């Protein structure tokens, strides 16, 4: 299950498909995705029902008022014991203390967080000692790789050319949505 079906979520879905994932479910605000990489798509309102059946939850959410604390203690409890949680979006989407508790009590199989709040985590943060947790320092995006830099330059150049020609920009931030 991929929570967030934007560019990052779609990229994760494509990678999962190439590794033979049996069923890839996506959840988004609208229950839609720009790319046809999911076996099923649901609106965020169905999150609780989907979590009960989720073995692998990949979170690729932006930081908005709607996503902050989305995976809270109550929702973590909905996940099966064998579930794994991966967060590559924003650290604010997970109630970190609840995640650490669930891992330490064996209510989740494991987790991997590339993002947390704050970054870097203080030495006394309970995530450092949580069982079956992998922490990485916000590096999953590989922003230093050549193809990532090339893609960023290409996006900028496309919008610059559109701006100069009086055409609509492609890569706009919707301030009301927060991303």
Regions found by a protein language model. Give the residues of each.
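Rossmann-like adenosine-cofactor binding region
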Residues: 22, 31-126
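Conserved beta-strand segments that form the floor/walls of ligand-binding pockets within enzyme
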Residues: 1, 78, 134
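Flexible, glycine-rich phosphate/dinucleotide-binding loops
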Residues: 9, 32-33, 142, 179
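Glycine-rich adenosine-cofactor-binding loop
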Residues: 1-17
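Short alpha-helical functional segments enriched in proximate histidine and acidic residues
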Residues: 15, 53, 159, 163
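Rossmann-like dinucleotide-binding domain for NAD(H)/NADP(H)
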Residues: 82, 88-179
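Short beta-strand "acidic-cap" motif of Rossmann-like dinucleotide-binding folds
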Residues: 24-26
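Amphipathic, non-transmembrane alpha-helical scaffold segments
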Residues: 5, 51, 149-153
């Amino acid at each position: 299950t991929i929570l967030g079906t934007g560019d990052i979520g779609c990229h994760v879905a494509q990678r999962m498909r190439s590794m033979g994932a049996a069923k890839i479910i996506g959840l988004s605000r609208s229950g839609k995705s720009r790319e046809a990489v999911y076996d099923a798509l649901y609106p965020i309102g169905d999150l609780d029902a989907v979590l009960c059946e989720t073995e692998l939850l990949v979170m690729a959410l932006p930081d908005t008022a709607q996503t902050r604390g989305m995976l809270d203690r109550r929702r973590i409890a909905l996940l099966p014991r064998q579930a794994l949680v991966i967060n590559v979006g924003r650290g604010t989407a997970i109630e970190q203390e609840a995640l650490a508790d669930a891992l330490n009590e064996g209510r989740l199989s494991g987790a991997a967080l590339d993002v947390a709040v704050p970054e870097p985590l203080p030495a006394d943060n309970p995530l450092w000692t949580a069982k079956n947790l992998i922490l990485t320092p916000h590096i999953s995006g590989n922003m230093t790789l050549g193809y990532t830099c090339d893609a960023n330059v290409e996006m900028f150049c496309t919008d610059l050319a559109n701006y100069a020609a009086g055409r609509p920009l492609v890569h706009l931030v919707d301030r009301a949505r927060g991303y």
